[in-house]
Amino acid sequence: MTVAFMLELLQPKEGEIILDVGSGSGWTSALLAEIVGRQGKIFAIERIRKLKEFGEENVRKMGYENVTFLTGNGVRGWPEKARFDKILVNAAAVDIPPALTEQLSPGGKMVIPLDDARGSMVWLGKNEDGTLQERRFSGFAFVPLIDR
């Protein structure tokens, strides 16, 4: 139910370019690939190489060709592929990484869990002038987003 809630907050749409941070087994990358369709693109980052390879294999087996994987530090995002219409983060950050908000397009949205006392899920919307709107929801638990 957590993934469904995150996707409901993110509101991915056909043709969008989305960054999937902490892509793991490839499950959320595949869901996003289906939603954005052939005109869209998913960029999936996983810091654990073997898990990235596992996710990449799973997504390929399912026939999705619009997903590109990277072994890397999700806190830093993927600046070479930025700007993203949406960013989905699948691990809890201590703070919202500035690199991710910078890589979000004006009009874009990001969903990110925070490692705080409330177990917050944060929805961010980036206005056309670059300012951010924020909504928080509590009661979630995630593995930590590691900066390395």
Regions found by a protein language model. Give the residues of each.
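Conserved nucleotide-cofactor-binding alpha/beta core module
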Residues: Q11-D129
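Conserved SAM-binding loop and adjacent beta-strand
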Residues: M1-L7, Q11-P12
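Short, surface-exposed secondary-structure junctions/capping segments
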Residues: I146-R148
